[in-house]
């Protein structure tokens, strides 16, 4: 987010629990990382590894807390590039399918931190 972005209901300015955060800026106790067996490098070599990690952490009973007090600059996909070749697209598709299968039950329940009255079809937080 841009530093001046307020987000929905000014949520960019408050600490809050989320289902997942990006591994580009992520911190946890080593013991928690080890307890959930870290990143799944076998099934999620590039995509979804951070979300999978967060899902495992939540399943173990911990919270994923986002804070506005940490700031980092992250240029998504600069080092790895985009999914612009058939091989990369196939890898991404495989990782997406593996994620959907692994977390099917949790995904069907919906995001506990997203208001179920708001649409998932657009990013404007309009009423469903």
Where does each model-flagged region fall?
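C-terminal, non-catalytic tails of nucleotide-sugar-dependent glycosyltransferases
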Residues: 1-18, 22, 27, 64, ...
């Amino acid at each position: 987010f841009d530093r001046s972005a307020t987000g929905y209901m000014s949520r960019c300015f408050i600490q809050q629990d989320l289902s997942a955060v990006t591994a580009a800026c992520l911190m946890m106790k080593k013991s928690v990382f080890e307890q959930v067996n870290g990143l799944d490098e076998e099934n999620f070599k590039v995509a979804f590894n951070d979300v999978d990690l967060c899902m495992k952490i939540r399943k173990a009973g911990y919270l994923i807390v986002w804070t506005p007090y940490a700031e980092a600059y992250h240029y998504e996909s600069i080092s790895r590039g985009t999914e612009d070749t058939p091989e990369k697209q196939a890898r991404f598709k495989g990782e997406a399918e593996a994620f959907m299968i692994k977390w099917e039950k949790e995904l069907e329940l919906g995001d506990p931190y997203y208001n179920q009255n708001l649409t998932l079809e657009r990013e404007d937080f309009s009423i469903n």
